[in-house]
Amino acid sequence: MNEKKVECVLTGTVVSSNRDKTITVLIERKVRHPIYKKYIKRSTKVHAHDDKNECICGDLVRVVEAKPFSKTKHWSLLEVVERLVSVD
């Protein structure tokens, strides 16, 4: 029974990176209203493990579902898709 597990990979924006090795990622999706057929934005915040502390607020990142790191942290940073360009 060699069953391959399907990895859940989501893309979102980092909204907090204040804690050590932990980032908060805001994941937005659009769902269709069942009666009015209009698309509505829905969002979810997840905590992800950032082992190298490489993310800052505003980065576009890809996270993958992983084994639980703590009570609320069940995601791991896969890659930084786009860095936030800071204007000084």
From Swiss-Prot:
Lineage of source species: Bacteria, Pseudomonadati, Pseudomonadota, Gammaproteobacteria, Candidatus Pseudothioglobaceae
Family annotation (SUPFAM superfamilies): Nucleic acid-binding proteins
Name of the protein: Small ribosomal subunit protein uS17
Family per similarity comment: Belongs to the universal ribosomal protein uS17 family.
Natural source organism: Vesicomyosocius okutanii subsp. Calyptogena okutanii (strain HA)
GO biological process: translation
Pfam families per record: Ribosomal_S17
Entry-linked CDD domains: Ribosomal_uS17
Gene that specifies this protein: rpsQ
Swiss-Prot/TrEMBL keywords: Ribonucleoprotein, Ribosomal protein, RNA-binding, rRNA-binding
Function of the molecule: One of the primary rRNA binding proteins, it binds specifically to the 5'-end of 16S ribosomal RNA.
GO terms assigned for molecular function: rRNA binding; structural constituent of ribosome
